[in-house]
Structures are given as structure tokens and as C-alpha cells.
């Protein structure tokens, strides 16, 4: 079959279990596509064909023996922030160019245990700091919908790989929108779970109180399959929560859109910089949900103006602490011929970290410094609590909250956005991480340049099943999630 890459996860699972094709055939199909198409997209940092085919053969044996899981033999790609035993894990940084992890991240361990096949590691913004995937030391990834545009970030490689049909689904991480914004830019579905729902063990840390892993795929159904594998408590992660895990696939039709109350924050739709096409597509998608029986309720989120300053104090402060471990001594990049220990520290960090990472370390170090700690960091933590309370108050009246995932569609690679402009582009996504809430992006159409637009739905704590179910039903009544970029239509 030449069009295996067009099948959904459910169709792939059925095809494998009915022996219509083998995991080896499926894996070889994707490896061929990567070899042919990825030189244009540049989504993969490392492709692992030998390991992938070994895992595919093991999956075929398990399928024959009748001891397979629901997903045995299906390939996937991992964001290059997840530690993978024996495979390079760079986090998009020169600092970790030579780092081969001695262990697997829990998410990777779980995908292996489920019989999924690892195709390789995909590109990202350096240490997940960015919204374009341009800050990676290996260079920018292209958006499959327009190769001279960015795929978003930081999980841009994950989004581009799925959108170009170079992987059926992928793992991502989201610290301030890094799953939802690239999913929006690339026309995909991406879920950021509640903080503590998916283990962070083995994820290279950016901001530990904000980071969360999740699935990126074409549809809510595909995301649900991956969530069934990766969600759950992990004793190795102290922030992981002991809470029963839903069967996300079984629950896909369990939330009725009829009677659902969707909150429309008036502050969100009056943000300066909200593109007219984005606003129009999001409003059309809400009208569709209204036709399906949902009620649209205008709400106030009065803390909206505080999102960006609060996030860009807390996240860099945590980053400056987390990234202090990269000093050129134990692992990672080490400068040549240091004059003394201080020179080793200074030069290893100056040469190993890119400009955006250095910028955030400086902001964070400043915010945590003795004279400014109370004025900046402590104050930001207090405002963070107010942002959380703002959402909880809204959820007393509504079931979910709707917003664009990003104020614009994808920008051109190399567009000279200054850092503050880039930070303001995160306005719709960062509050979700500050509050620890779950949120999902769904593709809802295109702008005048045929670039994808995304609708974001924000849920109350632990409502991943509800969010996936709402988007699944929306996707049964629309076909935006089935649209493919021209490059994805190419055969290997």
C-alpha cells in the first residue's frame, strides 16, 4: 500500500491486527518518506532506522503471538527533549550536542512498553525556549503548509513531522503553548494535559512548574490513543499526581456538545494583534459548535493583561536555575583549553547556549537576584495565583473556555520579530500553564494565504476526556483535520 500514511491511528491498529500489512512494512514506509521529504521540511534531528526496524520486527512477533497492545507496531516520533537510552538527546542545543542519555524518559518507556516504534527524534527550539523552532542549533524546521514559514514552537519538529506525514503522531511538551501553538500553525490537534497528568521524568527541564508532555496528531481520536499510553502516575516524578486515568478513546463520545456551556472571554477577542482571519475562523468554529447544541457565554477574564509579564518572570527564573547544571564539567559542551575554572564555566556556557536561552537565563537570574526577588519573582507568584482563581471563577459558570491558540498564523522564517513581540504572541496559551489547566488545539480552517488556524479549548482540571470528546465530535462534523499540505501528498 502506498498510502499507509493517510490512515488514522485506529485504521493503522486495525490493519496491523488483521495482518493487512506488517509493522515492518509500515515502518519502512515512513522511513522512505522521511528520506525523501524531510530534507525539505527538516523536522528530524536524528532518524533511527536500525532501532525502528528492530522494534517493528518485535512488534510483528507480538502481533503474531497474540500478545500485542492496541498500538503495537505503530511508529511515532519523539521531541528531542525526551531522554532516549542510547540515542542522542540534544534539546536543540549545542550544549547537549554530544549527550546520549543512559536511560529512557518515562513517556518513552511507556511508548516502548505499548509496542510503539520509535522513528527518531524531532527538532525543537533550544531548551524549548521559543515559538518558531528557529533557535535550534541544527537550524530551522519548515512548516509543511509553506516551507518558507515556521511550524511554530517549541514542538515545531513534532508538528512538522505529523503535518508532512513523516510520523502518524508525535510526543511534544508544553511550557507556555509549545504543543498548542505549533499544532495551530500546522493544522493539527494537540493536547496539553493538566499539570501532573503525564510524567516529566526524563524530560530535559525548562520551567519545572510549567512543563507538561502531551500528544500531537491529526485528530482528537489519534491524540486519545497516545494519551492512553502516556498518562498516569509515576513515582519517579514528584509532581506526578496519583489519580485514576481515563480511557480517553472509550470516552470520545461521552461529552454531549448539546447543552455544553462554552465561555468566550471578551478580553481575548479584543487583543491588539489578533489577526482578522484568525478571529473569523475561530468565530466560525464557535458558531458550528453552537449549531451542534452548545451555548456560547460571554465571560470576563480580568487578569489577561498580567499573563505575559507573569509568565516571562516565572519561566526564565526557573530556567536560570534548571540550566545552571550545564557548566562544562560533568556532561554537555565543554570549551577548549580553558585558562581556569571560571573561564571553563563562562566560555562553556557562552559558547554552548544560543542567544534566546542566554536572554532568558539573564532575565531569570535578574528576577531571582537578592535586590529584586520580592519585587519580581515573589510578586509574579502571587499574580499567578490570581490568574488561577480567575479561571476557577469562570468555570463556575461554563464547562470550557474558547480562545484562539495564537493571535496570528505562522510567520515567515527569519521574520525579524523582536523578542518582546514574540513573547506577546504567547498571550492565549501561557495562562493555561501558569494555572496548570488542560487545553487542546483543533484545526478550524485557513487564512487568506492558506495557512492553518487553530481553536483552543481550555478545560477545568483533569478534563482531558471532555476536551478530546468535544473536539472529536466537532471533527465528525467538519473536515479541517483531514486537510493535508501539498508536501504530505507526495509519495516516497
From Swiss-Prot:
Against InterPro entries, the record matches this protein to: Amidase, Amidase_CS, Amidase_dom, AS_sf, GatA
State the protein's name: Glutamyl-tRNA(Gln) amidotransferase subunit A
- Is the keyword RNA-binding assigned to this protein? no
The biological processes this protein is annotated with in GO are: translation
Question: What's any one GO cellular component for it?
Answer: glutamyl-tRNA(Gln) amidotransferase complex
EC no.? Answer: 6.3.5.7
What's the subunit arrangement here? Heterotrimer of A, B and C subunits.
Tell me which species this is from. Acinetobacter baumannii (strain AYE)
Family assignment from sequence similarity: Belongs to the amidase family. GatA subfamily.
| Role noted for this protein | Allows the formation of correctly charged Gln-tRNA(Gln) through the transamidation of misacylated Glu-tRNA(Gln) in organisms which lack glutaminyl-tRNA synthetase. The reaction takes place in the presence of glutamine and ATP through an activated gamma-phospho-Glu-tRNA(Gln).
Superkingdom of origin organism: Bacteria
The GO terms describing molecular function are: ATP binding; glutaminyl-tRNA synthase (glutamine-hydrolyzing) activity
Q: Which reaction does it catalyse?
A: L-glutamyl-tRNA(Gln) + L-glutamine + ATP + H2O = L-glutaminyl-tRNA(Gln) + L-glutamate + ADP + phosphate + H(+)
Going by the UniProt record, its keywords in alphabetical order are: ATP-binding, Ligase, Nucleotide-binding, Protein biosynthesis
Where do the catalytic residues lie?
79, 154, 178
Q: Does the keyword 4Fe-4S apply?
A: no
**EC class (word):** ligase
